[in-house]
A protein has these predicted regions:
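Membrane-interface amphipathic segments in extracytoplasmic regions
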Residues: 1-219
């Protein structure tokens, strides 16, 4: 979840075979880079979607001990800002409130106001139309990817070095990581510019486990 997961998966697809699962992306960006189409079907039914959490994958897969299990994490203060931009500029965005849509020309006060309102906005993330706060949904989904037994955790801040270690574990040499979705965030401001005391408290509270476990800070 905004920690280069799509890019890491895509980097490994050239080494996958016809029986391997590649969830891919619903967007055209990966095709323009020359990567494979999705292969996430069992028979006629797609069973693994992009960013499928471990509890969806492992019960229908082989024994977990047969696999190297790794994930990636990112400083949540930065990841939430990335999700803020993605929520409005993704091709399938369901957030239609363009009053909150960030713009590269926004000043810091405008960004702070939009960002705080975004954190406290309710949206529907399922077909049942149930509403929940965006920040709560994002934080709960994030936990699914590191609250399981893992063999390695890649830190977004050390992406290339950590991914090279994963490649070594599975017998691969150095692999270049494609930078997917990197054009979504249209502002070069440091993530701290987006925060007020209130928004800082919200993100700190919702990601307290991640912050404590990985020694992340607001800097």
């Amino acid at each position: 979840m905004k920690a280069a997961g799509s890019s890491l998966e895509l980097a490994l697809t050239p080494f996958c075979g016809p029986d391997d699962i590649m969830t891919g992306s619903p967007y055209d960006e990966e095709k323009s880079l020359g990567y494979y189409d999705r292969n996430n079907k069992l028979g006629y039914r797609a069973i693994w979607h992009q960013h499928a959490p471990p509890d969806e994958v492992l019960p229908v897969s082989f024994s977990a001990k047969d696999y190297l299990k790794f994930t990636s994490v990112r400083n949540p203060y930065d990841a939430v800002v990335s999700y803020f931009w993605w929520s409005f500029y993704a091709p399938d965005s369901t957030l239609k409130n363009h009053m909150l849509k960030p713009d590269r020309l926004d000043g810091s006060k405008e960004l702070q106001s939009k960002f705080l309102t975004f954190l406290e906005t309710y949206a529907s993330f399922n077909t049942k139309g149930q509403q929940e706060k965006i920040i709560d949904w994002f934080a709960d989904r994030y936990k699914l990817f590191y609250k399981v037994p893992l063999d390695f955790i890649i830190r977004y801040e050390d992406l290339d070095v950590d991914f090279s270690m994963v490649c070594g574990m599975i017998g691969l040499g150095p692999i270049n990581i494609p930078r997917l979705k990197s054009n979504i965030r249209k502002s070069s401001y440091n993530y701290r510019v987006y925060y007020t005391n209130r928004s800082y408290d919200i993100v700190t509270d919702r990601f307290s486990d991640l912050i404590d476990n990985f020694n992340y800070s607001f800097q």
